[in-house]
Amino acid sequence: VTSDTQHPVRVVQLGGLMPFVREWLAERYAAPSLADLSDPSGVRVAVVGGGARAGAAEMDALPDLGAIVNFGVGYDNVDVEEARRRGIVVSNTPDVLTDAVADLAAFLVVDVLRGITAADRFVRSGAWARGERMPLTRDVRGAVVGVLGLGRIGTAAAERLEAFGAVVHYHSRSPKDVAWTYHDSPVALARASDVLVVLTPGGAGTDKLVDADVLDALGPEGHLVNVARGSVVDEDALVAALEDGRIAGAGLDVFADEPHVPEALLARDDVVLLPHVGSATVETREAMARLVLDNVAAFLERGELVTPVG
């Protein structure tokens, strides 16, 4: 794909986008992939999703780049500091996926406490038919659920869990104007929790925030749920804690090196594994795509973004 004076290429796709998003971009902007772009001059917007990288190399390849539009609320795949240094603005897709991710977070809490997927495996294995007994599980009502990161999604998840009768505690950068119990560190929150739910954004500041100390504080009866970013949890420490019985189990929708999941986790019945589907509903993904298009249009027309990052 080349650009000319009549039909300049102003938008490029960096990868990781769903087919319908690629089609929408192609229809509206004739947006090719970076690999198919023979002349990068004049490209003002790069759209990226699915964890595809938008770093210095990609920015070097697009000398006129002015904006990186990310399909997703998390943007640790984008080198925001490098973009800022070059005067490139970055957007994400907040708010529109809040409900879907909060729903999944709440469902995973219910699952790890009530053993829903474990019970499904129990039936399918023939254990029930053989007269074996499924172990007793835990009530959601009265359980202390610690929400690590009380942003939009964390708040929505906490509200759902409170409706189940759970007791909500939380940690964030500072106390919020809420009735829930605040803790001043992840370790303190984990120590008070039956289930620790990770909902903090990714990025350098949260890399391996949930480490061995946090997991030890959670304790042998505690469960970890992560629907944020795989980078937030020290995966090696998590595997070790599970193998040593230092925590009771986990529910994970995200991993450090997706789509690769550690073999040690695949082999465990006390872990619920999902393929990063927190926002994977038709309605949510379409809303995210519309917000991506709104950001692209706003930047090309006015030099501004609808949902800029930081």
Where on the chain are the PLM-derived regions?
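Phosphate-coordination loops involved in phosphoryl transfer and adenosine-cofactor binding
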Residues: 8, 65, 141-144, 221
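An N-terminal-biased, well-structured beta-alpha scaffold segment characteristic
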Residues: 1-93, 191, 211
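Conserved beta-strand positions in the Rossmann-like core of class I SAM-dependent methyltransferases
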Residues: 169
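C-terminal helix-to-coil terminal segments
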Residues: 2-8, 84, 91-104, 131-136, ...
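Glycine-rich Rossmann-fold phosphate-binding loop(s) that bind the pyrophosphate
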Residues: 150-151
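Phosphate-binding beta-alpha-beta segment of Rossmann-like dinucleotide-binding domains, i.e.
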Residues: 94-144, 156-159
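Rossmann-like adenosine-cofactor binding region
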Residues: 54-56, 173-264
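Short, conserved active-site loop motifs that form the nucleotide-linked donor/cofactor pocket
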Residues: 29, 88, 180, 270-271
